[in-house]
Amino acid sequence: MADHVQSLAQLENLCKQLYETTDTATRLQAEKALVEFTNSPDCLSKCQLLLERGSSSYSQLLAATCLTKLVSRTNNPLPLEQRIDIRNYVLNYLATRPKLATFVTQALIQLYARITKLGWFDCQKDEYVFRNVITDVTRFLQDSVEHCIIGVTILSQLTNEINQADTTHPLTKHRKIASSFRDSSLFDIFTLSCNLLKQASGKNLNLNDESQHGLLMQLLKLTHNCLNFDFIGTSTDESSDDLCTVQIPTSWRSAFLDSSTLQLFFDLYHSIPPSFSPLVLSCLVQIASVRRSLFNNAERAKFLSHLVDGVKRILENPQSLSDPNNYHEFCRLLARLKSNYQLGELVKVENYPEVIRLIANFTVTSLQHWEFAPNSVHYLLSLWQRLAASVPYVKATEPHMLETYTPEVTKAYITSRLESVHIILRDGLEDPLDDTGLVQQQLDQLSTIGRCEYEKTCALLVQLFDQSAQSYQELLQSATASPMDVAVQEGRLTWLVYIIGAVIGGRVSFASTDEQDAMDGELVCRVLQLMNLTDSRLAQAGNEKLELAMLSFFEQFRKIYIGDQVQKSSKLYRRLSEVLGLNDETMVLSVFIGKIITNLKYWGRCEPITSKTLQLLNDLSIGYSSVRKLVKLSAVQFMLNNHTSEHFSFLGINNQSNLTDMRCRTTFYTALGRLLMVDLGEDEDQYEQFMLPLTAAFETVAQMFSTNTFNEQEAKRTLVGLVRDLRGIAFAFNAKTSFMMLFEWIYPSYMPILQRAIELWYHDPACTTPVLKLMAELVHNRSQRLQFDVSSPNGILLFRETSKMITTYGNRILTLGEVPKDQVYALKLKGISICFSMLKAALSGSYVNFGVFRLYGDDALDNALQTFIKLLLSIPHSDLLDYPKLSQSYYSLLEVLTQDHMNFIASLEPHVIMYILSSISEGLTALDTMVCTGCCSCLDHIVTYLFKQLSRSTKKRTTPLTQESDRFLHIMQQHPEMIQQMLSTVLNIIIFEDCRNQWSMSRPLLGLILLNEKYFSDLRNSIVNSQPPEKQQAMHLCFENLMEGIERNLLTKNRDRFTQNLSAFRREVNDSMKNSPYGVNSNDMMS
């Protein structure tokens, strides 16, 4: 250890400095010294001394965290004996010191949990030494309340620890441990926890006694952790709370068939203080969500009846629900009533009529108090949305009574939102309309609720809209109207326009009637009349929120009533014709385009409105029939002939705006490109006419670049806007004829300008990202649009430009030096990722014969590939998987390289080859299926190449192996562990995981086995021997069947046979292991 960390006193002083000092420099110095201490050889013994003799809680905390790091490390792990000693020491330490500082106790319990988890499969004398967890805590549970709290916390923390995957160990190992813990210990822990809770609820708990208080809290946490366990390894996304089913194992059935378990939590809810209730309700949420298949129909009905009774009791005594946490959890519980049970089952519950009345009243009251716990409203609306959606399908004879209650819920939502407007404006409160994501989520739910008893919904909306619209019109005509009154009516109309859009969007074709379509017509007429009024005032004033509501309405209207699938005889169109003279879809489309042009004219500097307006235009341009109708409109022809900043201000160069604000231009030109293509054909004059503004922009930038002094900001803005426009056009031009016009326009005239921009501004991603993205789009052979004539060299010329851009950018970006971690993606990795995508698109586009480059001494291909390697080696492995876009672009490029350019891969330096193989090895266990599948494909190509080269080297051939192949073989023979590790990983995933891409995994496996037959044999024996004696023969037979009829070659027929064998093998192994109490105790398989 370093000289300055000599004694315990010094260590304690460093801890004090680390946790207590306010001086940053002192803290950093202490942190550095303590990191050295953690990495020192005598750290373990010093930690024990700190725990034994340390005088401060901070030194005990340091010892516990250092020990946790030591037992967690994957390289140079601690021996088994040492870990057993640490585990026993920690238990004794906690037992003899029940009054430690809370954070020290917590850290020591974390240490125990980590040792137990990581050692779950460790054996000593045929005994799993870390599995006696209940025995470990029994002595705590039989002692004082403080000891009891420690014992319960140990179980709670252990359950939590085993449930959480960590990045330092493979996911396969985590799932294996979690499954074994679930099968061997979790139910006993849950039962123990429930029994202790029953004892606690049976006594008159003295909740003024803090220790009793703490015990109850820890028991509830433990129970919740048991119920929240990821039983089958599917909860990768914990942020989602929808359609959640708790996959309780069948062996737990008895606990849930016993009604006293459910009753326990409802009794606890009513008998303990409100501060504990949220945890009780969280447990009830999980219990209510147990999988349906755990019960038969009669059992489920009985369970549901008890559940509904408990909910009814809470609703009849709602005092505790005034606590926001209680209220939130109770709303979640209500939502689970419908997500896990069918309406047909609910209506058969004895108290259903009373309960649905209570829930409706509770919902209406909640909606009226809109300012209280707004995040909980989602769950209530979710319940009613699911109830309403089930009405057409319910077959039960019992009345569901939703025709009575859904209109009440709809009315409460609508009126409460309107009433909130005045209060929010008066008191300066946060406006829910500012959170468009939340508003949209609620409106999606309301769209289904509102369509139930739609006549009542429409009548209410018409009445409220007419009142607000009339008041609004009167205020606008009055000279004395206050701005506050105008703002209130605009706020109310904003909500109404949003809601009308939502209920129209909720139309379901098979359940709609002519009468309902006519009602939609009534609502649409009113919104369009309001639009005419507000548009006429835009020169003086406009309301951004109301405009966004209008765009939301137009988007819903487009989805339902415009397009190829809509019946034109709809009653809606008849109503539009009667009131507004809009006789058909073409006339309605002209209204859309008129609104789009108006918005772009008046709101060109308002990014939210501009981007949503352009998205609407883009969506309209996709439809086959609508785009053909649009082109005939004079307004669209105006856009095609006048797309300049003079008419559309957002196309201008605004020095105040951010460069990234120009993103919407790509959307605009994608739509214009589609519209232009409808009648373009081979008309080059029309094309050149359309491109005039872009030609002028390119000439302006070229002029600037030709002088030594130019306005850099203006040049950047002009160029960035231009390349964003061009990318939109390039994306839209997916036919050969139109794309060739674009290609011949940009090459060779303007390509040097793009290259010059990369040279000048490589360090500014706001400039390089749009340029690189344009190039990536130009080389993408979308819909086979890049088909050059046989006499044309354009394919090769295009690749030369691609190579030049990648090389220019790559070599310069590597000169940036150290980039801060929080900026590394924006400044460096994003551009590299686009370069990888660009190179992949060019290499896989099938419009270049890459063999000619070497033949004619052209270094374009070699330069691009060498730059790829330089860029790759500048990226840490962890970053490759941490940034999803980078992962996908890298692995898809690597797939193409291993498939078509394996000679290049084989020619790389040993450390580069090992880097690439390591990245494949890590990618095999990635959560992203695309990445994992790509890695399988890369590995298959490499293994196939290796196998072929090995086969050739053993045969007498007239053509010897190339120098690259020979070297590659030598490297692989020098480092067999990398390929062996991947064989182990692939086999592990296939046997133990929910393998979603089994076919992809099977392809490299045969090659891996044939290249490593001895290793595979050892691996197989290890797996077989780890099974209990009575299972070993069956497992041995599984492996025999896997290789049945497989020859020593990688021909397609042999591969297909192996893939079939592997499917059967996976089934048989899973069946064999289902009833096995043992796991696979193989270091190869587990590490």
Curated annotation (Swiss-Prot):
Subcellular location: Cytoplasm; Nucleus
SUPFAM superfamilies attached to this UniProt entry: ARM repeat
Start and end residues of each Importin N-terminal domain: 30-96
BP GO annotations: protein export from nucleus
Keyword field contains Transferase: no
The keyword 4Fe-4S is annotated on this UniProt entry: no
GO cellular component, one term: cytoplasm
Short name of any one Pfam family annotated for the protein: IBN_N
MF-aspect GO terms: nuclear export signal receptor activity; small GTPase binding
Keyword vocabulary terms for this entry: Cytoplasm, Nucleus, Protein transport, Transport
Family: Belongs to the exportin family.
The protein's role, per its UniProt record: Mediates the nuclear export of proteins (cargos) with broad substrate specificity.
Protein name: Exportin-7
Species of the source: Gallus gallus (Chicken)
Gene: XPO7
